[in-house]
């Protein structure tokens, strides 16, 4: 029998992530309540949102979806992202009133998350903690965080994310030129300022080095200013979809970011690392949150220091054999642990375990 699952998207939710993985689960038909038609094999119900402010807040969107309460109970499950998203609070009420099972997908790795203390996030969090049938954790740290919050083990499952191994694949010929790729939101919490400063140090020793930046965000002007100087070696590529991301990664020798925590966010995993590793790139980044769950040795996690970041980049840029060895190991690691179809089947198994109780 086909599982019928309703996914209520957050406002501004990014494509080809949680909803996409659910849509790949065997024996599952997903209906997405979302502002825009998502890619993939699923049904779409257009959604509009009530938003007191027009911004996305990490760990929860300050927005309510208008159409949810009017939907008939034509589903077995309803699901959403993160405990303290206001949409999750709505989904909890919807599931309770219609007798449906509820799943919450979560990356959150900090039980001291500041948003948990702020109404109305607090109400959404407490309702989901009390009533959700399944917490599908996308990192092990999220499961630890739920245990601290008192969630019983029977409702917790961990399935780490997968990626498209046919799209994110290594270049036919490894890149010999010293090209760095920063593919991430262009924001200070992702360390774009640190990367630019470290790259300036790299250029002193490797004048041929180039830094290519792909992404959008609040600090684009910083990157544009660097790229405007022909002597900087910085190229700003703007934004791009998954196909362009994969192409830019295959044209680079090393992947780099430098995240640092904020009052409401710390790095949980980092899909950009996963995609870079699938493309056979070594990764250099900073120690932040729980990114050690994906950035495993011999990739480098350094302290939040420009000189340390530059030194790690130079070690790889000046040693092509080491780069190739790390890149080959990364591809193998992702193939063995993060194939999106294998991980989607594991997600489906998590739902089935709850259904069998």
Task: Enumerate the language-model features and the residues they cover.
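A short, histidine- and acid-enriched strand-loop-helix "catalytic/donor-clamping" loop
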Residues: 11-13, 100-119, 131-134
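Acidic donor-binding loop of glycosyltransferase active sites
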Residues: 250-265, 281
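Short hydrophobic beta-strand element within catalytic cores of glycosyltransferases
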Residues: 273-285
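Conserved acidic donor-binding segment of nucleotide-sugar-dependent glycosyltransferases
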Residues: 296-307, 315-321
